[in-house]
UniProtKB/Swiss-Prot annotation:
Record field: transmembrane: 372-392
Organism: Gallus gallus
Domain of life: Eukaryota
Polar residues biased stretches: 115-125
Protein's UniProt name: Fibroblast growth factor receptor-like 1
């Protein structure tokens, strides 16, 4: 039972860990879609992820935004109303989060019932060719460079130029006419060179040149057409503007993951850069810094800038495995040729719930090994005992007698002559002045009491007292008392 519970917990942990990662496709996708002209179609983007991904749609490499009036980006996918022939092409849903991105691809085919009705009277082969009663081969028109026609929505600034191509072939050789907003263009607007009639050149664009340009290619067998949408925009006259409330102050757990967002509105695609303020005293950690508003900042790596349907641009800064040094002020900087704007936010990183173990203080000995606990006091006692023993042995050595020979002077019979006087260093228990006074008192007691009193008064100094009595030639008797001192 315990083993099964452990395996169950391990599986739950593994599932929770695996949930965080790049976006993934959550449902089956039918990549080839078809729709009839004038109808409505919805292309789904069934992706999921943790954290939830951001999605954007592209058609033939061009980002779909709010200017595409018949296109609407929903939470579930892309909705196209009143489908036109030029809506055919390749669509991509790109989903991205902080761990990566994934794409969902579609190929949209637009079915034109009216064209098929016109051609229904003509016996066609599978490739648009047929043979008449005389045996001649005929072929309806077809575009020979479809790869150069994928980009159907084109934006250009005022004063620039653009070329719209509709190169086609057929048998008999087809003709081509150009229309703007369903009105034929004049010959001088197209050009008289037949070799260039398949390409429409628009030079020195003006705002009034915006519109839908259609090429109609036809022969006796059939007809094809293609439409381009041209947007002529005024050159930018203002610096970028940061919209919304982002970036906002954020708090993250130690080791966790968080992000800052930055939404910038600009007439042209701006440069979005993230900066982090360099805290005082940490300048040496960075190779280069920049000054913004009188403060030093370091430039951070920046990911892809996304174009949003509302015409704004979005960028995200991901912070993974947050540490204490990640805390501080962050700046989102949006710039174009006219200037820049920025906005700041602060990141707070909560303390590590499991900080590294601190060094054990000297007062705490519970975590020290037992050999150390026993060895240190034992070593100290051994050293102290050795020093104490050495001092005791040193103090037991006898003091050297004075170098000069004792001088014998005649003394009265009742006086005591002290032949040896201890050194000051040998008298450790009394001071020298007390010793002299006691010595005089000792001698005044007479020879009979002196030895006994001396041994009582100085038990550690007087170790041997003896008396010598001898007579000289002159008949005088001298008595000497010898006292042996020992420290």
């Amino acid at each position: 039972m315990g083993l099964q519970l452990a395996l169950l917990l391990a599986g739950i942990v593994a599932l929770s860990d695996s949930a965080r990662g790049p976006p993934r496709i959550a449902d089956k996708v039918i990549h080839r879609q078809s729709v009839r002209l004038g109808r409505t179609i919805k292309l789904l983007c069934p992706v999921e992820g943790d954290p939830p991904p951001l999605t954007m749609w592209m058609k033939d490499g061009r980002t779909i935004h709010s200017g595409w009036t018949r296109f609407r980006i929903l939470q579930q996918g892309l909705k196209i109303k009143e489908v036109e022939s030029e809506d055919a092409g390749t669509y991509i849903c790109k989903a991205t989060n902080g761990f990566g991105s994934t794409n969902v691809n579609y190929t949209l085919i637009v079915i034109d019932d009216t064209s098929s009705g016109k051609n229904s009277q003509t016996p066609e082969g599978s490739n648009g060719e047929y043979e008449d009663h005389s045996g001649k081969q005929w072929a309806q028109p077809r575009f020979t460079q479809p790869a150069k026609m994928r980009r159907r929505v084109i934006a250009r600034p005022v004063g620039s130029s653009i070329r719209l191509k509709c190169v086609a072939s057929g048998n008999p050789r087809p003709d081509i006419t150009w229309l703007k907003d369903n009105k034929p263009l004049m010959p001088h607007e197209i050009g008289e060179n037949k070799k260039k009639k398949w390409t429409l050149n628009l030079k020195n664009l003006k705002p009034e040149d915006s519109g839908k340009y259609t090429c109609r290619v036809f022969n006796k067998v059939g007809e094809i057409n293609a439409t381009y949408k041209v947007e002529v925009i005024q050159r930018t006259r203002s610096k970028p503007i940061l919209t919304g409330t982002h970036p906002v102050n954020t708090t993250v757990d130690y080791g966790g993951t968080t992000s800052f967002q930055c939404k910038v509105r600009s007439d042209v695609k701006p440069v979005i850069q993230w900066l982090k303020r360099v805290e005082y005293g940490t300048e040496s950690k960075y190779n280069s810094t920049i000054d913004v508003g009188g403060q030093k900042f370091v430039v951070l790596p920046t990911g892809e800038v996304w174009s949003r349907p509302d015409g704004s641009y979005l960028n995200k800064l991901m912070i993974t495995r947050a540490k204490e040094e990640d805390a501080g002020m962050y700046i989102c900087l949006g710039a174009n040729t006219m200037g820049y704007s920025f906005r700041s936010a602060f990141l707070t990183v909560l303390p590590d719930p499991k900080p590294p173990s601190a060094p054990v203080p000297p007062s705490s000995v519970s975590s020290l090994p037992w050999p150390v606990i026993i060895g240190i006091p034992a070593g100290a006692v051994f050293i102290f005992g050795t020093i104490l023993l050495w001092l005791c042995q040193t103090k037991k050595k006898p003091c050297s007698p004075p170098a000069a020979a004792p001088v014998h002077r005649p003394q009265p019979r009742d006086r005591i002559c002290v032949s040896q006087v201890p050194d000051k260093d040998c008298i450790s228990s009394i001071n020298y002045e007390e010793y002299v006074a006691q010595q005089q008192h000792l001698l005044s007691q007479g020879p009979a009491l002196a030895p006994a009193m001396a041994s009582k008064m100085y038990p550690k100094i007087y170790t041997d007292i003896h008396t010598h009595t001898h007579s000289h030639v002159e008949g005088k008797v001298h008595q000497h008392q010898h006292i042996q001192y020992q420290c």
